[in-house]
């Protein structure tokens, strides 16, 4: 009934050409991270946009996320070892073998540089090859042109 792959919990990074996806740890929860979550431009299309975030609320969220069957990765630029955002694989349905993905590039100076595209490719490779999922769902608000463009790649 459930995939034998549902118990895979990744402790290693997914390696790309320019970015690595690193399983999210508390060390990524910094003041810089909180600044992203306080930036209306960054959170406009995210569920967190209406909440005041603190180190404690984010730590609790990450701990709940990491103790579930969901995956959250920090997107880190390899060359400079810089955390620029996160990508998730969640709401995994093992019976029908699909999941939802979400991405946030929090550091706006890295928007439109292809880092999100590479991160998504790494996540999809992991989802399809390692977890043996068949479908990944991604959505975008009608006025989120960057999200729509990203979803059509």
Where are these regions (language model features)?
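Acyl-donor (CoA/ACP) binding surface of acyl/acetyltransferases
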Residues: 1-29, 39, 72, 76-153
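An amphipathic alpha-helix signature
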Residues: 26-34, 38, 55, 59
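Short, solvent-exposed alpha-helical surface patches in well-structured domains
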Residues: 31-32, 44-45, 60, 82, ...
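Solvent-exposed, non-membrane alpha-helical residues enriched in polar/charged side chains
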Residues: 34, 59-63, 124-128
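Short helix-loop boundary/capping segments at the starts of domains
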Residues: 39-42, 67
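Conserved GNAT-fold acetyl-CoA-binding loop/helix
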Residues: 41-61
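A short helix-loop-beta-strand connector motif used in the catalytic cores of GNAT acetyltransferases and
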Residues: 62-74
């Amino acid at each position: 009934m459930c995939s034998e792959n549902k118990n895979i919990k990744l402790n290693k990074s997914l390696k790309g050409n320019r970015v690595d996806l690193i399983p999210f740890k508390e060390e990524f929860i910094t003041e810089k991270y909180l600044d992203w979550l306080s930036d209306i431009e960054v959170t406009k299309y995210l569920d967190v946009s209406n909440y005041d975030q603190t180190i404690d609320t984010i730590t609790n969220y990450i701990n709940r996320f990491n103790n579930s069957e969901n995956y959250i990765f920090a997107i880190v630029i390899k060359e400079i070892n810089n955390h620029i955002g996160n990508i998730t694989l969640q709401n995994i349905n093992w019976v029908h073998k699909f999941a939802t993905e979400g991405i946030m590039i929090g550091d706006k100076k890295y928007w439109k540089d292809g880092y999100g595209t590479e991160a998504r490719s790494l996540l999809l490779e992991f989802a399809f090859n390692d977890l043996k999922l068949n479908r990944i769902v991604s959505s975008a608000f009608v006025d989120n042109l960057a999200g729509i463009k990203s979803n059509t790649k």
